[in-house]
Amino acid sequence: MNKKVVLMILDGWGIATNPKVSAIDAANTPFVNSLYTQYPHSKLEASGLAVGLPEGQMGNSEVGHMNLGAGRIVYQNLVRINKAVTENTLGQEPELAKAFDYAKKEGKAVHFMGLVSDGGVHAHIEHLKSLLSTAQEAQLPKVFVHAFTDGRDTDPKSGLKFMTDLVQHCDKTGAHVASVTGRYFAMDRDNRWERVALAYHAMVDAEGHLTHDVIQSIKDSYAADVTDEFIKPIIATDANGTPLAKIAEGDVVICFNFRTDRGREITQALTQKDFHEENMHRLNLYYLTMTEYDKEFNNVHVIFNDSNLPMTLGEVLEGAGKKQIRIAETEKYPHVTFFFSGGRETPFVGQTNILRSSPKVATYDLQPEMSAADLRDALIPELEKEEVDFVCLNFANPDMVGHTGVFPAVVKAVETVDQCAEAVVKAGLAHGYSFIIIADHGNADVMINEDGSPNTAHSTNLVPCILVDAHDHPTLSNGKLGDIAPTILKLMGVEQPKEMTGGALF
């Protein structure tokens, strides 16, 4: 075979086990439905051990794209960190030990900041609790937590449970919760610096709602219809109303999120550059991150460093002299570039990246179409030229709108993708392209919890794999995301390298 291939990723389009709670099943998707009757298809595992995550852990876009591009199971930092937590060896990690020594010697405060939930997508509360226990063993006198509440990878009001658990653990280990801010502000990844500024000023200047009872303030927030993701900064005070802690020059700050993309902006504001419009100034801190957020960051220490993956699909295609396009809107652009390339920023020879801006709306239920039509309109002319050999295309809608939990909007998002996918596939088939249509994980397939409340998190459901080809209709095996790159190489007639341990699906 010597085909040209488009990998079309319908982000968050899982296979529902209960159609009643699925926006995909509720949506009118004549095109994707027609593919199931005409073309070979199978199911892929996109969560848990099959993608290098702990058993039962839902997949996510970062992990999904890494496995897709690598053509193998990529053992995630989460698994490595979990091992250190369960074996109680976090304190032996050299960068963490050095930071604790510095804090002790210099009498500096240690501030932990990150997402406090068991969602396991960006962070895990058990990691934080283990860090706090490790800090206690190191006899650090001043330890504070700046908690970001979740409500996106977990239920919208589960923050109360997690924060109660955290406060109890702090009481045991001598630490204190200093501030609480919703992830919408603290973990932006779309250059909404006005959001990031709220989190920055909460931690650095103790700006926010002052309270002697953080848990009660979270309850008050719920009563005002503000759920975890959107909680405005809450500042913990002592009995006299004085804030317990502010991040100050020379302090140790540890961002314990292990996923990289949503820790970058707050790290930039605290350590890399001044944002005068938002009155954010970088501080001289002893700053650590759980994993490497950005190779370009200066003076940021990394607790769990990872190496670039060799021989990803992009590198193999470069070696074969093939041209490739990576195309997505802002929200998923790092996924089709950095993560699909195994943690590499630099494009390969013959690689063109096409970016379209995600709409500037507060939440994507307000514009469920997002920028899917822009991607369609950008890619079709490229396919008509017949020059590019491989395309990695991501439609973000089912995932990004799925995270809002607004069912009718998610239905609209799914229908938008069905229409745009149809236009791209028809154009591609007319110009000799084959398509592998998949999802990287589920989301829109489970929109309602058993108690009737909206589900805003990813699912652990299987995802579809459809091979759309004008001529060849081989039987497709079921598999995992790490089998897709070998399948693409087989279609393209390019030899699979030994580093790719996944197997072609036909």
Regions found by a protein language model. Name each.
Residues 1-506:
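Feature captures the catalytic ectodomains and active-site-proximal regions of enzymes
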